[in-house]
Design a protein with these regions (language model features):
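HotDog/MaoC-like acyl-thioester-processing domains
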Residues: 1-7, 83-133
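Catalytic strand-loop segment that frames the active site of acyl-thioester-processing enzymes
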Residues: 1-47
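Short amphipathic alpha-helical segments
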Residues: 20, 55-56
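Hydrophobic beta-strand-centered segment that forms part of the acyl-chain substrate-binding groove
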Residues: 42-46, 56-95
């Protein structure tokens, strides 16, 4: 069983293919994500990844950090900076609360741009951890 303060970081590089597949699966073809000519005309100057694509990395990181048979009970997210295609993101999970008797954990979730440390997505997740074996 992990203790409060336990933290793990994962590195993920966002690719154009990831953004395209996310658009296809969700139907979110907002041109800021998939149309480079349109994106050049925006304040960002280039395509940005879907915020929820980055949020989805938290789900993967929670499984890798706390075990594959745990259950995701909730997640809140704030999108604080754009993530661009080609950015490498550091996805960090930190256990900040734990109800051991119920195996319920509260996890701080943060996605930072590796190149400059900008926090791009942050929030908290509540998970039911897998029982120890």
């Amino acid at each position: 069983m992990h203790e409060i303060g336990y933290s793990k970081t994962y590195e993920i590089t966002v690719t154009k293919d990831m953004v395209q597949k996310y658009a296809e699966v969700t139907g979110d073809f907002n041109p800021i994500h998939v149309d480079e000519d349109f994106a050049k005309s925006t304040k960002f100057g280039k395509c940005i990844a879907h915020g929820m694509l980055i949020g989805g990395f938290f789900s993967r990181a929670l499984v890798d950090t706390f075990g594959g048979s745990g259950i995701y009970l909730g997640q809140d997210l704030k999108f604080t900076n754009p993530v661009f295609v080609g950015d490498t993101i550091l996805v960090q999970m930190t256990l900040i609360g734990l109800r051991k008797e119920k195996l319920i954990g509260t996890v701080e979730t943060t996605a930072k741009r590796k190149s400059n440390g900008d926090v791009c997505v942050k929030g908290q997740a509540v998970i039911m951890m897998a029982p120890p074996r």
